[in-house]
């Protein structure tokens, strides 16, 4: 492995920020991996909730795009991308739509907390460009995703999930099916 040469474009980009961006890339890829696992769980013949599958596949793609955007930023700022192993999801069986939505809500809150810590680091290192990037491309979207998942969890519970299989079928058909994956 060759050592990377110093960047000629690097300016006001602290090494702690560079390292934090690499950690955030890993977290976004992990989130994408979790959502991919969820998607194909709901696509199984014995689960057969196609709109849950579509919803989580869309989320997986979004998280991968978030990682790619951070990788592009890393290169633009003169940082170096160091990829790490992506942890596998904590489970393979997501049990129910409600359980998966609760896990997704927890995941999005963890991603959001990491972004808030990255923003604080950028503030502490006096990096207005990184602050603006996080604010513009991530923070508002995270809040909206958390709200949407919270609403989904609430509605599934009100409908009687997970005790009622009919609740998840109707939610899949009428909420996720009608929304066409609105974010």
UniProtKB/Swiss-Prot annotation:
Catalyses: 4 Fe(2+) + O2 + 4 H(+) = 4 Fe(3+) + 2 H2O
List, alphabetically, the GO terms of the cellular component aspect. Answer: autophagosome; cytoplasmic vesicle; lysosome
The residues listed in the UniProt record as binding Fe cation 1, with positions renumbered to this chain, are: 28, 63, 66
Q: What is the lineage of its organism?
A: Eukaryota, Metazoa, Chordata, Craniata, Vertebrata
Instruction: Please state every residue range assigned to the domain named Ferritin-like diiron.
Output: 11-160
Keywords assigned by UniProt, alphabetized: Acetylation, Cytoplasm, Cytoplasmic vesicle, Iron, Iron storage, Lysosome, Metal-binding, Oxidoreductase, Phosphoprotein
Q: Which PROSITE patterns would you find in this protein's record?
A: FERRITIN_1, FERRITIN_2, FERRITIN_LIKE
Q: What protein is this chain from? A: Ferritin heavy chain
Assembly: Oligomer of 24 subunits. There are two types of subunits: L (light) chain and H (heavy) chain. The major chain can be light or heavy, depending on the species and tissue type. The functional molecule forms a roughly spherical shell with a diameter of 12 nm and contains a central cavity into which the insoluble mineral iron core is deposited. Interacts with NCOA4; NCOA4 promotes targeting of the iron-binding ferritin complex to autolysosomes following starvation or iron depletion.
């Amino acid at each position: 492995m060759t050592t990377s040469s110093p960047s000629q474009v690097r300016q006001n980009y602290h090494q702690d920020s560079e390292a934090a961006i690499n950690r955030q890339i890993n977290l976004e890829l992990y989130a994408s991996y979790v959502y991919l696992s969820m998607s194909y769980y709901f696509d199984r013949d014995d689960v057969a909730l196609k709109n849950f599958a579509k919803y989580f596949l869309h989320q997986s793609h979004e998280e991968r795009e978030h990682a790619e955007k951070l990788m592009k930023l890393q290169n633009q700022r003169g940082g170096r991308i160091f990829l790490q192993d992506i942890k596998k999801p904590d489970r393979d069986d997501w049990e129910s739509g409600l359980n998966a939505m609760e896990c997704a809500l927890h995941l999005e809150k963890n991603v959001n907390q990491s972004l808030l810590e990255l923003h604080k680091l950028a503030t502490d290192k006096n990096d207005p460009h990184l602050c603006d990037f996080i604010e513009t491309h991530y923070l508002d979207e995270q809040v909206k995703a958390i709200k949407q998942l919270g609403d989904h969890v609430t509605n599934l519970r009100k409908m009687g999930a997970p005790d009622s299989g009919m609740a998840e079928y109707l939610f899949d058909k009428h909420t996720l099916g009608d929304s066409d994956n609105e974010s």
